[in-house]
Amino acid sequence: MIFSKDSNVTLVVTSCGRFDLLTRTLASFDAFNTTPIREVFITEDSGDRAVEACIPHHWREHTTFFVNVPRLGQLRSIDLAYSHVETPWVFHCEDDWAFYRPGCIEES
């Protein structure tokens, strides 16, 4: 995965306690994404900071976590993350997605 301050894309991921699925989703995105990403926002609606262990190590300095206590629900979690986005484009995914080939953002 390529991170760039010049990128016009932010990755937003919503999650709720399914850390095994989230880890797989992020690993597959890391393996196949070909578009530079400015930053990553992950909303975790379970209130569990264990979410921070799910990201690939090289994402750490580019990732912001929103761990909701109390729970906000999916739509408010999305609104929270989007309120911090500074890029014109958002690539949004959920904790149970799988990426299997390059070009997913470019083709979106």
Label each residue range with its predicted role.
Residues 79-89:
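Active-site nucleotide-sugar/metal-binding loop of Leloir-type enzymes
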Residues 97-107:
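Acidic donor-binding/catalytic loop of UDP-sugar-dependent glycosyltransferases
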Residues 59-72:
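Conserved donor nucleotide-binding strand/loop of the catalytic core
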Residues 69-76, 82, 100:
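A short, glycine-/small-residue-rich helix N-cap motif at loop->alpha-helix starts
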Residues 27-37:
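Short, acidic, metal-binding catalytic loop of nucleotide-sugar glycosyltransferases
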Residues 88-98:
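Short beta-strand-to-loop acidic/aromatic patch adjacent to the donor-nucleotide binding site
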Residues 1-27:
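N-proximal low-complexity "stem/linker" segments adjacent to membrane-targeting elements
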Residues 42-53:
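A conserved acidic beta->alpha catalytic loop
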